[in-house]
Amino acid sequence: MSNVPAELKYTKSHEWIRVEADGSLTIGVTDHAQEALGDVVFLELPEAGRQLAAGEACAVIESVKAASDIYAPVDGEVIASNQDAVDAPESVNADAYAAWLFKLKPANAGDVAALLDAQGYQAEIANA
């Protein structure tokens, strides 16, 4: 069973979202996603300053098995990308919740409430 931390929010497309004290969002891929992908070998992340729409493909994660898009969970502006993860993509496999991919300043903080909680995400992956 995949690790699904209770304090995070989730999307049906397997991104996790941590709401930071300043209201910004830290985003990565879930443990379930990295298990399904296998060994991650490449990441392409959005640049700071890029405006994203909810559901927009904004990054790519490639493994030895497949390449998958990563989607913006809400509308907002990219404020940082994790160069350490780009330099060592295998870090996503080692700890999917420590190896964040990018940070987003949400256009509307209320949009985060509509994302899945841990229980909702667990139900989503159980039915997949």
UniProtKB/Swiss-Prot annotation:
CDD domains: GCS_H. The keyword Lyase does not apply. PROSITE patterns: BIOTINYL_LIPOYL, LIPOYL. It holds the Pfam family GCV_H. The glycine cleavage system is composed of four proteins: P, T, L and H. Belongs to the GcvH family. This is Glycine cleavage system H protein.
